[in-house]
């Protein structure tokens, strides 16, 4: 499987994404600069965290105007997996690929620590290697991770089982319904504030995030290699 890791000015988690795919899973991966205009040669797209364009105007707003985002939408429309983490999640909401928005943390502070997450839906291409209801430990690092949407959208997320991860026990940012990660209705676009790519090696803080990437690869192989 071949992944694209997008790189915007101000991205700083692209290297961790690359490491998770290349070194931990042994899959093919390339960095793709935000000015690129073709993602057709990739099987999946990873939109990393960081501070794209310095978070000026609004987190993810300027990145959404980059050339590459039109291609990301094509990838999503084709049913290929798209994962946005932290700033990547913010970019995906700005692009309209996921509903809602990420607001300032309610304590107005940048939060950087490991949190507990609950796997609310393990029947997705991003979570099939987890158990339903499993509690995992994943780092966060954000100042604007407070997920918000209107009541109609929230009900739709619940009805369609699109809430994939929630904060368990302690909500670090005030996110609505403790939401930490959601997928689109089709199930091939996931946005999450915690950083699974920072939890892929038990020697350096835990490996609970590795299953996100293993899940993507497993689903892809079932759909392509075994057919």
Swiss-Prot record:
An example molecular function term from Gene Ontology annotations: ATP binding
Keyword annotations: ATP-binding, Cytoplasm, Glutamine amidotransferase, Hydrolase, Ligase, Nucleotide-binding, Purine biosynthesis
Domain Glutamine amidotransferase type-1: 3-226
Family annotation (Pfam families): GATase_5 (PF13507)
Pathway annotation: Purine metabolism; IMP biosynthesis via de novo pathway; 5-amino-1-(5-phospho-D-ribosyl)imidazole from N(2)-formyl-N(1)-(5-phospho-D-ribosyl)glycinamide: step 1/2
Active site annotation, chain numbering: 86 (nucleophile), 195, 197
Reaction it catalyzes: N(2)-formyl-N(1)-(5-phospho-beta-D-ribosyl)glycinamide + L-glutamine + ATP + H2O = 2-formamido-N(1)-(5-O-phospho-beta-D-ribosyl)acetamidine + L-glutamate + ADP + phosphate + H(+); L-glutamine + H2O = L-glutamate + NH4(+)
GO cellular-component term (any): cytoplasm
GO terms classed as biological process: 'de novo' IMP biosynthetic process
Subunit structure as annotated in this protein's UniProt entry: Part of the FGAM synthase complex composed of 1 PurL, 1 PurQ and 2 PurS subunits.
PANTHER family reported in the protein's UniProt record: PHOSPHORIBOSYLFORMYLGLYCINAMIDINE SYNTHASE SUBUNIT PURQ
Functional note: Part of the phosphoribosylformylglycinamidine synthase complex involved in the purines biosynthetic pathway. Catalyzes the ATP-dependent conversion of formylglycinamide ribonucleotide (FGAR) and glutamine to yield formylglycinamidine ribonucleotide (FGAM) and glutamate. The FGAM synthase complex is composed of three subunits. PurQ produces an ammonia molecule by converting glutamine to glutamate. PurL transfers the ammonia molecule to FGAR to form FGAM in an ATP-dependent manner.
Protein name (record): Phosphoribosylformylglycinamidine synthase subunit PurQ
Organism this protein belongs to: Lysinibacillus sphaericus (strain C3-41)
């Amino acid at each position: 499987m071949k992944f694209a890791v997008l790189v915007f000015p101000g991205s700083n988690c692209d290297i961790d994404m690359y490491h998770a795919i290349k070194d931990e899973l042994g899959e093919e991966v390339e960095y793709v600069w935000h000015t690129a205009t073709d993602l057709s040669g990739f099987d999946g797209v990873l939109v990393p965290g960081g501070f794209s364009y310095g978070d000026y105007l609004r987190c993810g707003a300027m990145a959404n105007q980059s050339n590459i985002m039109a291609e990301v939408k094509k990838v999503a429309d084709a049913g290929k997996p798209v994962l946005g983490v932290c700033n990547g999640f913010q970019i995906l909401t700005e692009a309209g690929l996921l509903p809602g928005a990420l607001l300032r943390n309610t304590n107005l502070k940048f939060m950087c620590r490991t949190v507990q997450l609950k796997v609310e839906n393990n029947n997705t291409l991003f979570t099939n290697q987890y158990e339903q209801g499993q509690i995992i430990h994943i780092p966060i690092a954000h100042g604007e991770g407070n997920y918000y949407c209107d009541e109609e959208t929230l009900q739709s997320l619940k009805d369609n089982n699109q809430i994939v991860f929630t904060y368990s026990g302690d909500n670090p940012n005030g996110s609505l319904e403790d939401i930490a990660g959601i997928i689109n209705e089709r199930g091939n676009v996931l946005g999450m504030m915690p950083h699974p790519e920072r939890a892929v090696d038990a020697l350096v803080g835990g490996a609970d995030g590795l299953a996100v990437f293993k899940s993507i690869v497993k689903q892809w192989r079932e759909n392509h290699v075994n057919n």
